[in-house]
Amino acid sequence: MLEGERSYQRGQENLVPSDNTSSIPESQVIPKSHEMPWYIQHFTKLLIGFGLGGGAAAILLPWFLWLHCGMSSGSSDQLRLYLLYVTGGIIAVLTLLQTNWKNQGDRLKIDADIKKNEQDAEKNERDHIRQVHAERRSRYTRAVEQLADEKATVRLGGIHTLVGLVDEWLADETLDPEEQQKEGQVIINNLCSYIRSPFPLATKIEDLQADTVPASYMGDFISDQAALREEQDVRRAIFDEMSKRSSTFNKDNEINVTPGIWSNFEFNFSRAPIFYTLSNLTIEKANFFYATFYGDARFRWVNFIKNANFFRAKFNRNTHFFRSVFTGEANFAEANFTQNANFGESIFIQNANFDRANFTQNANFGESIFTQNANFGEAIFTQNANFFRSTFNQNGEFLRTIFSHDVNFGEVSFEEKTNFFRAVFTQNASFRKAVFNQNANFNETTFTQNVSFREATFIQGADFCMATFTQKAKFYRTVFTQNVSFRKAVFNQNANFNEATFTQNANFNKTVFGQNGSFDETFFGQNANFRKAVFGQNVSFHKTVFSQNANFYRAFFTQSTSFYQTVFTKNVSFQDVSFACETHFDRAVFLGNANFYKSIFRGNVGFIKATFARKSRFFGAIITGNGDFSKTTFEMYVSFRNATFEGDAEFSGASFMRNADFQDACFTQSHSKFIAMDEDSGKLCRAQFAALPTDWEKHNFTVHEGSQPIPLGTTELDGVRYSIPVGTVLFDPDSWDERQKEYTRLSEPAQ
């Protein structure tokens, strides 16, 4: 006997009345207040007595008074008449009392008859109800027995009988709602118990679904195949009937759920073997805790009403939840997906939990909607994972998640916080055009292969602290609206930030770029911090704009470095920076103070046509290769104090608009060049020094004692003589011609 059947019978011991129940007595006891009064008991005697007595009094009393008291004849006749009236009245009253009592008795008898008839009817109704309930229980018992029948048609008939009995109990108006629910739940438990019952052939479903007999198959293939298909139909029928009676909803604009007649029941499919399709159904309170799915698990277009529990469920073959809707919480924690899992275009109205789930093959969540929190913490995706165009309306949790193969978060919308803390991406990862509307945490995340955030948008903070990028990292045209941190991040291969936008602070403190780092045409809206950053190979900041302070303090550039046409709007610091190879600042624009204090340039460095709008300091800088400052413009004070030029120092065509300080500079190999032939124009290109007011500090060309000297000559402008390098000229800072783009008042070359 099934467990559900035993519980059902135990429940009936308290529901069925015992056979010893006393019946309503047939005779009725007359109340004491309705007993016969004395005047009714002696009615005849009283009637005769009053009649005779009144008649005698009417004859004798007037006669006696006439005879002995001298009453007149007329008065005696009048008295006689009065006595007769009184006697008649008494008799009439007595008769009325008797009639009234009789009427009351008739009414009591009628009421008693009516009450007896009602009691008889109630008894008959109770007997009928007991008979109906007994008949239902008898049908229930037979239906439960049918579930164990060998014939599928008989089992199917038992299922339909049980389903009908549930509906009958719910429609039984003789029971209160609690009793209706209790009776129906007993049958529901039996149906769920049948779903949970083992079916050995389910383990052979892969062989039995083949068109031909597998060579290694043990058993009667044809018979087993037929039995499997029959049982699939039988068990699917249970879900069909449940679906018809479950809640309905529409999702045109918003999810509106309308309860069904079975919506208050509890359904338990835990540890059930599922080996049949469940697509196109409504499943309410789906509890598949520890369930095992043999063959493909098909839940396409299924509406899960209220919570759906697949905790530690095991999916042995492909899993299909395509376009399914989960109106309650969806729990797939620690579920095991052995083959492909497809949740494409699914909708999760409440929290979705895939914590520690294991996806052995491809997992597809493309275009799915997670309305509330989505948790994939510590989940494992062994093959490709696809979240393309999915929407996370609340927090997206990928804490310590492992993506062993390619993963696609392209065009995903993260509306709330996103957490990829210590997540591992073993293969390629794409976040192209993804939108992070709240804080995004990639702290200590590992990207083993290529990763792309191309054209992604981070509306709030982005944290990539101590993240590891083993292969190429692409942030091309990525937009960071708030603060972003790559502090101590490691880029082992190329890092591409070309045309990226950092609206707020960008922190690359102690970041390591193992190979090429590219920031071409990147925009830094606030402070950019590259303190102690390490650039392992070529790095490019072509046409990059730093709107606020830029800090490269003690950064290390291992290979060639280019800041070509870069714009530093505020202060920039390259203090103690080491440039190991060729470096270019050609046409760069420094609108704030530029600090190259004790920087080391171990290869050639070029500042050709660069512009320093404010103070520039090269104090103690070391240039081991050639240093080219030709046609550079120094609009404010420039200091090369204690700087060392081990190669050629080219200043031809440079413009020094304020005092130039070369005190204790050291030119170890050759003289500094302040004039040279311009290859393009064929003209001699001379450095220019502003004619400073007399109260200003003069240009200083007193080099270090062991240095090659700067050959000086003299020239004058406006009657003031200056010592400047031979061949260079003085100019009047106020003589700039905007049309000709040159100073018009120049001195003769210094001699």
Please report, for each region that a protein language model flagged, where it lies by residue:
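Hydrophobic transmembrane alpha-helices
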Residues: 50-74
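N-terminal leader/targeting and pre-domain segments
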Residues: 129, 138-145, 151-156, 160-163, ...
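Short, charged cytosolic
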Residues: 2-29
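Feature of secretome-associated and extracellular-like proteins
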Residues: 37-41, 56-64, 291
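Juxtamembrane interface helix immediately N-terminal to a transmembrane segment
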Residues: 19-54
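Membrane-proximal alpha-helical anchors
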Residues: 29-30, 71-171, 175
